[in-house]
């Protein structure tokens, strides 16, 4: 098997003595996403939400810690958002550097060191933009529409093929392939010439990958699908 699905996780397989369990909520490389969270009992669940923060509603109460780099949906790189349960703060090992101790930042209102002010300012603008669109719930509805436009086409096509098990598909990153590597290369070249950039799949996976982060409008996804239909007609 390959990493194109989220495995079923049986609670009995989790060690109750573990310090924490970790998942990547949305895998940008393989295009998978957790739709059902593992039941870890009393052991804290930790997750990276860098690629889905602000894109869908998340019940943060189910986690011990969530963290996200800003660079996908929040703003320029340089800011990390951390949501941590109060009882998990202040338990750092003695060898933990000051800057890597969450208590340092919690006690100093995230101002222990000089913050990246411009990146934080841009993040604030993005937060206001999300609120103006109706909040995260409204943004999620838009993202679901975008994803359905692309996935519906992939499911109906016998030329393009989505690579992820349908129930585990990401709203943000959709990998897909054509029947041959030659066609993959031709599609990427022609798509780039037509103005569709960064469609080449991750180097470890190959094929193509369409990223549909919050800033991508529905119209952008529809134009991509229209181009894919044209390419299919001309090359099938």
Could you describe each region identified by the protein language model?
Residues 2-52:
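Active-site phosphate-binding strand-loop segment of PLP-dependent enzymes
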Residues 5-7, 31-36, 55-61, 77-80, ...:
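A short secondary-structure junction signal
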Residues 46, 60-71:
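Conserved active-site segment immediately N-terminal to the catalytic lysine
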Residues 70-151, 165, 234-236:
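Active-site C-terminal subdomain of aminotransferase-like
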Residues 159-163, 195-201:
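A short linear hydrophobic-aromatic micro-motif
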Residues 160-191:
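Conserved PLP-binding catalytic core of the aspartate aminotransferase-like
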Residues 193, 202, 206-236:
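PLP-dependent enzyme catalytic core of the Aspartate aminotransferase-like
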């Amino acid at each position: 098997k390959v990493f194109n699905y989220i495995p079923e996780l049986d609670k009995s397989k989790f060690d109750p003595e573990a310090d924490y369990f970790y998942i990547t909520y949305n895998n940008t490389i393989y295009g998978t996403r957790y739709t059902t969270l593992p039941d870890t009992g009393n052991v804290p669940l930790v997750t990276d939400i860098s690629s889905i923060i602000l894109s869908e509603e998340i019940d943060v109460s189910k986690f011990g810690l969530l963290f996200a780099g800003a660079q996908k949906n929040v703003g320029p790189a340089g800011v990390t958002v951390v949501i941590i349960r109060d009882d998990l703060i202040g338990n750092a090992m003695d060898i933990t550097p000051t800057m890597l101790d969450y208590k340092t930042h919690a006690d100093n209102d995230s101002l222990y060191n000089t913050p990246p002010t411009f990146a934080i300012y841009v993040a604030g603008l993005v937060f206001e933009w999300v609120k103006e669109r109706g909040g995260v719930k409204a943004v999620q509805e838009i993202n679901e529409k975008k994803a359905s436009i692309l996935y519906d086409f992939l499911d109906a096509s016998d030329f393009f093929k989505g690579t992820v098990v349908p129930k585990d598909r990401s709203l943000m990153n959709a990998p897909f392939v054509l029947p041959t590597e030659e066609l993959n290369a031709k599609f990427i070249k022609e798509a780039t010439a037509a103005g569709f950039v960064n469609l080449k799949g991750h180097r470890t996976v190959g094929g193509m990958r369409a990223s549909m982060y919050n800033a991508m409008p529905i119209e952008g996804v529809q134009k991509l699908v229209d181009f894919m239909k044209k390419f299919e007609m001309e090359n099938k």
